[in-house]
Regions:
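Beta-sheet-rich non-transmembrane sensory/scaffold domains
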Residues: 39-729
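C-terminal motif of bacterial Sec signal peptides marking the signal peptidase cleavage site
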Residues: 34-37
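N-terminal secretory signal peptides that target proteins for export/translocation
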Residues: 1-21
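Sec-dependent signal peptide recognition
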Residues: 23-28
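Residue-level signal for mature regions of secreted extracellular proteins and peptides
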Residues: 31-32, 338
Length: 729
């Protein structure tokens, strides 16, 4: 698997792990189950109940969500647990998983940001690259135009962020280090949000606790003559608790940064977004049900199916529902309470998965001293998340996904259900559900970019094959699907039927041409206004241009074939320029992946897209920051010029054993696009570190933790171990 990019290698390695801590671009255990909407509050702060309105009518299709009457949740869960027992499963999460969306793909947003009130106006700047303007995503480096907040690892090769630091920009463009705080060792943070006019940071991540159980809960009912030994038949600790962590940090100007309070929500983190001062966190909770599925102990016989089913009758709502806790800074104990009541959860009766999982949407007011919050939940899992400034869309599957022979396989013909929630501050309202053919793929960093809201319609690009591979060499020789990709347009019906109706699909009878060639996978998808751009790849890189101006009659208007592929498509320059940047990999005509490829496309003529220029950096095995997630690029629009910075690890040295290349240096590679002349220009590279020995590059800090931001005429490169390199552009 040496030719695979690191995100794909990690995905393969983790497909059989049901309870691993969520990591960037990782795979975690998820059951794909029934979905619904719930309300609830939290202890230790001001709870805002979701608004009470007219109850939705009974669903008219299996996709829609139905309200749960008292006792219905418990009955539903007991039914699912009995199904698991009948199937011979040994844990609630066995046999089902999905990708956590801890990271989603990157797209440029306007670089000019309004500075905090009461502070001297800093220059315009480019911070985290986002999918939607006005919808912030967590990242390890943020700036308000005057200060830089960074989260860093302690040593090269580490995978855990251990320090939060602040640096202040000086008049000459240099950085002055402020104070830093150590992050709790038991928490694994993914990134931070900046809110409340720069006065508060919200760090988001997870806390996973392991234990070696010493007692079998059903041992006394198995056999009175069984040995009482406590030796385990399995040598590995068991996950006993997974919680999403929200650490609120004071970041007022002129004060040292310091932790303010911490919230814990049962379940692992799917992803988070911030709109204005409201943090939205999506989490997913897999109850353990230890009485039903005890860890086997040496000397104790495994419980029979009848004994397991008897334990199911003793399951109660507190065993099902997640909790939330808040601990103010300096407090000795946290206040804990259920996140929701059982009657707050809704069900999707037609869901075929047997696993039990609750997914929660929690809104937190970061500007509120008491951290007022509200929650909605649904019974089921999530394998895709997209958020506009007004709505949150959660994509799910009603069928399980399994790993087999290095491939990921959807059972039967894959379909994706999409549930829409309206959001406005603390208000979270279920709006409706729809279903589309295909699925969002297996790469968690890209699933959100396969959805886009435009004029209240949701456009979705799905992948039609029931199996996927991680790299060209694993690609099957043939694929039955006629079109690798399907475009669907969904519209809320506006009535009482809580539906997202499919108003158009492509290909269709009128326009049957496939999107992609047989055997290809969907790599990059980018929606821009009334257009969509889709990249598929197996041996060459077809770029398709879709005209969505008439949502009832979408069409493919243009196609461009080049060597290699683009993992990400990023608009550059003014919209009128019609320019797009592609970042991915070069490849041979046989599909063998080579170095990092950066391409400038002219898509101003939808019928005739052109590749104006391209650069290939390094040999096979070279990586860019975008191989590790959506935030591995920084774009700054200055008039008709776009300044581009991408961390890269460049392989140029042939191994002493021959046959492959090893890392030569790690750096920030820079380009500039002139939208008037439509040119791509190289800028001097900021070298972070060079590798003297053959294996030194493999021991260096991961590109996953390298970033850059631009402020005025300066660029700041966060490199190895949290060290900044400041330079004029």
């Amino acid at each position: 698997m040496s030719h695979l990019n690191p995100r794909h290698r990690l995905a393969i390695e983790r497909t059989t792990q049901c309870h691993t801590p969520a990591v960037r671009y990782g795979v975690v255990a998820v059951a794909l189950l029934a979905l619904g909407a719930c309300g609830g509050g939290a202890g230790g702060g001001t709870t805002v109940s979701p608004p009470v309105g007219v109850e939705p009518p009974s669903p008219i299709s299996p996709v829609a969500l139905a309200a749960s009457e008292p006792g219905a949740l418990l009955s539903y869960v007991q039914k699912k647990l009995n199904q698991q027992i009948d199937q011979g499963l040994t844990s609630n999460s066995e046999g089902a998983f999905a990708f956590t969306g801890a990271l989603l793909s990157a797209v440029a947003t306007p670089a000019g940001v309004t500075p905090s009130s009461g502070v001297a106006s800093p220059p315009n700047f480019a911070s985290t690259t986002l999918q939607e303007g006005g919808v912030d995503e967590s990242d390890i480096l943020k700036t308000d135009g005057s200060r830089l907040f960074s989260m860093t690892v302690a040593r090269p090769g580490d995978q855990q962020l251990t320090k939060l630091a602040v640096h202040t920009r000086q008049a000459d463009g240099s950085l002055q280090a402020g104070n830093s705080i150590a992050l709790p060792s038991e928490d694994r943070f993914n990134g931070l949000h900046l809110a409340a006019n720069g006065e508060r940071l919200a760090l988001v991540g997870q806390n996973v606790k392991y234990a070696v159980p010493l007692v079998n809960p059903l041992a006394s009912s198995v056999s009175s003559t069984t040995s009482s030994t406590t030796a385990l038949t399995t040598p590995f600790p068991t996950v006993v608790q997974t919680q999403t962590v929200i650490n609120i940090v004071n970041s007022k100007v002129g004060q040292p940064i310091g932790s303010n309070s911490t919230l814990h929500i049962d379940g692992y983190l799917i992803d988070s977004r911030t709109i204005d001062n409201t943090l939205y966190v999506v989490t997913s909770w897999l109850p353990r049900f230890d009485d039903v599925f005890p860890v086997p102990l040496a000397g104790n016989a495994s419980p029979t199916a009848a004994q397991r089913k008897e334990a199911v009758t003793r399951v109660t709502n507190p065993k099902i529902l997640p909790t939330v806790s808040i601990k103010p800074d300096g407090a000795s104990q946290a206040s804990i309470q259920p996140l929701m009541a059982d009657t707050d959860c809704q069900l999707q009766a037609a869901n075929a998965s047997s696993a039990v999982q609750l997914t929660t949407i929690t809104a937190v007011n970061l500007a509120s001293p008491s951290l007022e919050r509200s929650s909605r939940c649904f019974l089921g899992g999530v394998n895709g998340l997209y958020m506009s400034t007004k709505n949150l869309y959660l994509a799910t599957s009603r069928t399980d996904v399994v790993a087999k022979g290095g491939s990921l396989i959807y059972g039967g013909e894959p379909t994706t259900d999409i549930h829409k929630f309206g959001v406005s501050g603390m208000t979270i309202n279920y709006r409706g559900s729809g279903s589309v053919s295909g699925h969002l793929g297996w790469d968690a960093s890209k699933t959100s970019y396969r959805m886009s809201e435009h004029n209240n319609d949701l456009r979705v690009v799905t992948y039609t094959s029931s199996f996927g591979w991680f790299g060209v060499l694993e690609a099957p020789s043939s694929v039955a699907a006629k079109s690798p990709a399907i475009l669907s347009v969904l519209r809320e019906d506006g009535g009482a039927t809580v539906q997202l109706k499919t108003i158009a699909v492509l290909p269709n009878q009128k326009r049957p041409a496939p999107i992609g060639l047989s055997g290809e996978q969907v790599y990059a998808v980018r929606f821009l206004g009334a257009r969509a751009y889709v990249v598929t790849f197996r041996r060459i890189d077809p770029l398709y241009v879709l005209d969505l101006a008439d949502p009832l009659d979408p069409k493919v208007t243009g196609e461009l074939k080049t060597n290699g592929y683009s993992d990400y498509l990023l608009p550059v320059g003014p919209d009128s320029a019609g320019l797009m940047l592609g970042v991915g990999k070069d490849a041979t005509t046989e599909g063998r992946v080579l170095g990092v490829k950066v391409s400038l496309f002219d898509v101003s003529n939808a019928a005739a897209p052109k590749e104006l220029a391209s650069r290939v950096i390094g040999k096979a095995g070279s990586l860019s920051g975008l191989d590790f997630g959506r935030h591995g690029v920084n774009l700054f629009n200055v008039g008709n010029t776009t300044r581009i910075a991408i961390p890269m690890r460049v392989n140029e040295t042939l191994s002493t054993s021959g046959g492959f290349y090893v890392p030569s240096y790690q750096s920030l590679v820079r380009f500039e696009v002139d939208a008037v002349n439509k040119t791509l220009t190289d800028k001097p590279t900021l070298v972070g570190q060079t590798f003297a020995s053959e294996f030194a590059g493999y021991l260096a800090s991961s590109l996953e933790f390298e970033r850059s931001v631009q402020i005025g005429e300066n660029i700041y490169y966060l490199g190895s171990q949290g060290r900044f390199t400041a330079s004029g552009w």
